[in-house]
Structures are given as C-alpha cells and as structure tokens.
UniProtKB/Swiss-Prot annotation:
SUPFAM superfamilies from the UniProt entry: N-terminal nucleophile aminohydrolases (Ntn hydrolases)
Post-translational modification: Cleaved into an alpha and beta chain by autocatalysis; this activates the enzyme. The N-terminal residue of the beta subunit is responsible for the nucleophile hydrolase activity.
Enzyme class: hydrolase
E.C. no: 3.4.25.-
InterPro entries with a match to the protein in the record: Ntn_hydrolases_N, Peptidase_T2, Taspase1
Matches recorded under CDD domains: Taspase1_like
The entry's keywords: Autocatalytic cleavage, Hydrolase, Protease, Threonine protease, Zymogen
UniProt name for this protein: Putative threonine aspartase
Organism per entry: Arabidopsis thaliana (Mouse-ear cress)
Residue positions of the active site: T222 (nucleophile)
GO BP, one annotated term: proteolysis
UniProt xrefs under Pfam families: Asparaginase_2
C-alpha cells in the first residue's frame, strides 16, 4: 500500500489492532494475520499525512477489519437468533474525550463510520437550533441517521444482509438453532417430569455450553484499534457483530461507553497521560466492570505499566463474576497502549517519542498486531496460552517501541 498525497515519511505514529479474544483455529490464522496487517497499513497511510487525524485512522483500520469475513465484525458477523446481522461499534477521541457509539444497527456494512461521525459532530457541535449532538444511537434509528449523513451505502437491510451474511455464519446459525431447539424440547420434558427440580435444566445448560465450546473457531465479540499520531493525539475504537445467537436488539461491549474502548490524554488529576485501551470478550460482565476505562485509570494511578494494569483489571472483573450464577464464558482480552510525547522546543507541539503496548488475555488465544514509523513492517501475532481449556488464568504480552529516529 502506497502513501497518498501529502505523506510525510518522517512523521511518527503508532497503531495497534486486535481481532478478538477466544479461540482462533489454526486454519484461520493466515486470514487473520493478513487482515491485521492490512488494518495497520490502512491506519498508517492516514497517520503519515500532514492532515491525518487519529479518528480517521482508527475508522479506516476498523473498516478493513469489518470488510473481511474472517472477523466477527461487519461482513461475516455472528447472526442474531432471527438470522440477521446487527452490529455494534464505538470510537473515542482521547483529546476531547468525545465518544460515539452505535448499537444493534441492522443492514450496515461499516458501523464504525457512524460512530466516527458521531464523535466529529460532538467535537464541532454542528447541530441545528442548538440541539445536543447524540453520543449513542441504536437500531434502525442509527441506520437512518447514518444514511441521512451520507456515510452509508444506499439500500435496504435485506440487500445489505446479502453481503454481510457469509455462508460460514449461516451454517453456524443453523447448527446453533438446531441445538437450541433440541435443548428446548428436553427442557420442556424435564419440567414435566421434575416440576420442582433444577438438575435437568442445569444439564441442558451445560450441554449448550459444551457444544458451543466444541466449535472449531470461537472468537468472542469485538475487534479493536488504537492509534497515536505524531503530536501524541490518541484515539481508539471497537466493532463487533456480537455473540452468536444473541437476542435481536442486544447492545454489546463494542458500543458501550467505558467498556469496549477508552482513550485519554490526561490522568485522573489532569496531568498529561496518553493511554488507549480496547477490550474483547463475552460482553456483559466486562460492561458491568467498565473494563476499558478501569484499565486506563488503573494504569494512570499505579504507574506500574500497561501489562500490570491490564492483568489487574482482567483478574478483577473475572473475580467479581466468579461467584455469580451462570455458566457463560468469562474469557476476555485487553489491548492497551501508553504513549510518551514531549515538547522539545518551548512553544512547539509535542512530538511522539515511544509507546508501550500490552495485551492480557484469559482466553485460549488473542490476535494482535502493531506498527509504527520505526518498524519496517507490521508485527502480527496470534497469542496462544499454554493453559488447558479448563484452566483459568491470565497470560500477557508486552513491548516498548522507540519511535524516534535512530540517526541524525
């Protein structure tokens, strides 16, 4: 991919991406590595521009992830119990603190486009008659708003689904639909035979969980991107098709403020502190824990480093949920970037010096990639735990990347 007009090869930047926590089958690894590489390059093309903005870079990278059928976002997303695609997405700008999210939006190829525009309109305050710009839109209303702003391809939900719904997703939906029907029939029979008992209902729930776990490729919820530009501006975003067989209208982690992504240029007490975080997992318990915001806050307060903060938050939300009723998957992944930017000449703009990147995950695998101006090509990895499937724990990866020129 070649840089466009106005590209400045001396501009410093950094981009980190992930394609979800869960289990990534070896057969899909090549496709996932390819899409992460292309997402990194799409963001870098914008960040090398003199006028390139982090919001646009995050949006461009996530659009690449949404358009690829190997991810659970946009095309190839998990289907609702009704057999349709409903997407969640959000984007946050670290400088302004503005957040834009869309939830359960049907018939949209790139939900991140709507989220990005929501952020921009809040920053500019461009509304008629002084109305407050929306921060979160859901369902058909989000789709209509996107069409009114000309950020969506014209067409009906049915027409969009023809592109969004892949054969793999449809086959998975049919398989899960049959499983649910079978379990439902057994539950009715069990209730008739044991009207006051719960043992058989619990067995049915366990059967569903074990059948789902046996699926070859099980990727939980979101994809995400974090971008930092030459001046130390930071932004991040998330996008997701949601969990398989979700109830229509369910709004998940990727659309929720403070949960799916978080970016900030200041610490809790107002001092400069550049940090961005994206979270992936079975969303409800991560939403209750405000996982992305908590990770950034913990990092700013402890100064122990991104890896320590990510592992601490992941262990905390897992522990809080461990005593609650239910057999839902509690695995997750957290990707966090802390950036260092300083003013070299008094009165001038800050300049990006280095970043620290960390990934913490309790899942069997977590697909991550990153790229910066001092790196020859994107570094891509499907991180895999050495733990057995039944073992609980948190693994991590961390690296520090110096983005300053190596010679004068």
């Amino acid at each position: 991919m070649m840089a466009g007009d106005g590209a400045d090869q001396s501009r410093r930047f950094f981009v980190a991406v992930h394609v979800g926590a869960g289990y990534h089958a070896a057969a899909n690894e090549k496709a996932l590595r390819s899409v992460m590489r292309r997402a990194c390059l799409a963001a870098s093309t914008i960040l090398r521009q003199d006028s390139g903005e982090c919001i646009d870079a995050v949006s461009a990278a996530i659009q690449v992830l949404e358009d690829d059928p190997s991810t659970n976002a946009g095309r190839g997303s998990n289907l609702t119990e009704d057999g349709h695609v409903e997407c969640d997405a959000s984007l946050m700008d670290g400088d302004s603190g503005m957040f834009g999210g869309v939830g359960a939006v049907p018939g949209v190829r790139n939900a991140i486009k709507i989220a990005a525009l929501l952020v921009k309109e809040q920053i500019t305050g461009s509304t008629l008659l002084g109305r407050i710009p929306p921060m979160l839109l859901v369902g058909e209303g989000a789709r209509r708003w996107g069409k009114s702003k000309s950020v969506l391809i014209p067409g009906t939900v049915t027409e969009a689904d023809q592109w969004l719904v892949t054969e793999r997703a449809r086959n998975q939906w049919r398989r899960f639909k049959a499983m649910l029907s079978e379990v439902g029939a057994k539950s009715i029979l069990s209730a008739e035979e044991h009207p006051r008992g719960t043992e058989n209902n619990e067995t049915c729930e366990e059967n569903v969980s074990s059948c789902a776990a046996a699926d070859e490729d099980k990727i939980m919820d979101t994809v995400g991107v974090i971008c930092v530009d030459n001046e130390g501006h930071i932004a991040c975003g998330s996008s997701s098709g949601g969990i398989a067989m979700k109830i229509s209208g369910r709004v998940g982690l990727a659309a929720t403020y403070g949960s799916g992504c978080w970016a900030s240029s200041k610490g809790p007490f107002g001092a400069p502190f550049l940090v961005g975080c994206c979270v992936s997992g079975a969303g409800e318990y991560l939403m209750r824990g405000f996982a992305a915001r908590e990770c950034c806050t913990s990092l700013a307060l402890s100064q122990a480093g991104p890896a320590s903060a990510a592992m601490k938050v992941l262990r905390s939300v897992m522990h809080q949920e461990s005593s609650k009723i239910g057999t839902a998957d509690k695995t997750a992944g957290i990707l966090v970037v802390q950036a260092d930017a300083s003013v070299v000449v008094p009165g001038s703009k800050p300049e990006l010096n280095a970043v620290e990147i960390a990934a913490a995950y309790s899942s069997l695998s977590f697909g991550v990639g990153y790229y910066g101006n001092s790196i020859e090509k994107p570094k891509i990895s499907i991180l895999r735990t050495r733990r057995q499937m039944s073992e609980a724990g948190v693994d991590h990866f961390e690296a520090r990347i110096d983005l300053r020129p190596t010679c004068c």
